[in-house]
């Protein structure tokens, strides 16, 4: 929840930051980009160190650290009177976002019973989307506080951050991590509280056996061996198009975009709430459809819809006076993203790489995804200043169209296959749709 909330709460503060820090000039456009994208740059650092720290200190300890960082970041950003301090606070928040977004799913997967592991990990992703939506509602209701409302928008995050920290105090450590440290009695106690005594004994035997048969570690350079190049090309490609088509830039600047379309400030915030609700609703739809229709149909339909929606937004800005069309097309764009590139990318990345390469590959591709996201968010204000909203959304639309061609050509269908079956099927370059 905090990951989604912290990432998008900045959208409400943008109109006020432009005034408070004097960011309306051409040079200010790039500074505004830094203010908004700083969380993304911090998240990259959090991504990079999360795995090492969670292996060394434990999953729970890292999550507690992220709670402290969330709290410190929100209060420092809310009280900042200097632009540099504000940037530092947002980078601090990014560290917590980057660490939490990788550590939380690992913790859930390691402590949850096998029968409910998939649904619980999915709920984690759903909570991020809900956090995004709640941030839009929070911003709307705090808007009436006047010129300092941006401070309240950023500072209110301290409440769920403090609650998050408090609840983590009552959460046990990951039993798998405890076993890696030889703390068998503690691991048994945790598993018994979650799964019962009999299941706990069996689970400890399975985990211990997996340590004995643990696959060799894969070096970074080995990921780029010839046999993995097509899979890596697809991984880097889908990660690029997920962010290069503008999703985070749109979320982070959403009220500003609606304002540029001609809406009043309060109306722009209200429209952002509607977009957030659509995002949540369509994420539920994606969870329901992904194992029924498959990955490729969702990707093809969703990315095509994104391209059409973005090009429609570009036209509406060019023609001017079409605020309602901008709203409808943005809702369509977010809905299409929420059933395609949003959830499907991470599902495919967790499926297509062989087990001994999976963790390293997802880490590398995830870092690339964060880099593209931060870059697109940084450049958005400067692009709007140089090209106008119409030109900016035209560029996003053309990239989405290119993404449709790329994904249609290379995306495999993995529905209904075990990971072991997929390893065999994807061991060589496959034609589009070969995996059924």
What are these regions (language model features)?
Residues 1-186, 190-192, 212-436:
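Alpha-helical transmembrane bundle of multi-pass membrane proteins
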Residues 200-211:
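Short, well-structured alpha-helical segments
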Residues 197-202, 424-428:
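Short arginine-rich
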């Amino acid at each position: 929840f905090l990951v989604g909330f912290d990432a998008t709460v900045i959208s409400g503060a943008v109109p006020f930051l432009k005034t408070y820090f004097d960011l309306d000039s051409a040079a200010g456009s790039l500074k505004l980009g830094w203010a908004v994208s700083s969380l993304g740059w911090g998240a990259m650092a959090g991504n990079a160190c999360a795995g090492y720290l969670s292996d060394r200190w434990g999953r729970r300890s890292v999550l507690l650290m992220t709670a402290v960082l969330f709290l410190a970041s929100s209060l420092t950003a809310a009280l900042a009177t200097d632009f540099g301090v504000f940037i530092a606070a947002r980078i601090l928040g990014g560290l917590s976002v980057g660490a939490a977004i990788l550590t939380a799913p690992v913790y859930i997967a390691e402590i949850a019973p096998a029968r409910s592991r998939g649904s619980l990990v999915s709920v984690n992703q759903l909570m991020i989307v809900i956090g995004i939506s709640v941030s839009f509602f929070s911003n709307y209701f705090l808007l009436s506080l006047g010129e300092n409302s941006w401070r309240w928008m950023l500072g209110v995050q301290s409440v769920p951050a403090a609650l998050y920290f408090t609840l983590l105090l009552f959460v046990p450590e990951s039993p798998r991590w405890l076993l890696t440290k030889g703390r068998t009695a503690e691991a048994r106690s945790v598993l018994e509280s979650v799964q019962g005594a009999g299941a706990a004994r069996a689970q400890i035997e399975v985990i211990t056996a997996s340590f004995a048969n643990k696959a060799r570690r894969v070096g970074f350079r080995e990921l780029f061996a010839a046999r993995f190049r097509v899979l890596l090309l697809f991984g880097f490609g889908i990660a690029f198009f997920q962010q290069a088509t503008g999703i985070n830039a749109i979320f982070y600047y959403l009220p500003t975009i609606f304002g540029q379309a001609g809406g009043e400030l309060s109306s722009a915030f209200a429209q952002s709430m509607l977009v957030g609700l659509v995002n949540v609703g369509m994420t539920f739809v994606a969870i329901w459809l992904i194992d029924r229709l498959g990955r490729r149909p969702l990707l093809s339909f969703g990315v095509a819809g994104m391209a059409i929606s973005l090009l429609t937004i570009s036209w509406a800005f060019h023609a001017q006076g079409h605020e309602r069309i901008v709203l409808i097309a943005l809702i369509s764009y977010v809905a299409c993203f929420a059933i395609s590139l949003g959830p499907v990318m991470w599902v495919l990345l967790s499926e297509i790489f062989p087990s001994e390469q999976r963790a390293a590959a997802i880490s590398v591709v995830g870092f690339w995804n964060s880099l593209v996201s931060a870059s697109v968010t940084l450049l958005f204000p400067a692009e709007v200043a140089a090209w106008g909203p119409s030109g900016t959304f035209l560029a996003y639309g053309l990239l989405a169209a290119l993404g449709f061609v790329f994904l249609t050509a290379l995306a495999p269908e993995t529905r209904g296959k075990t990971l072991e079956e997929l390893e065999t099927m994807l061991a060589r370059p496959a034609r589009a749709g070969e995996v059924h």
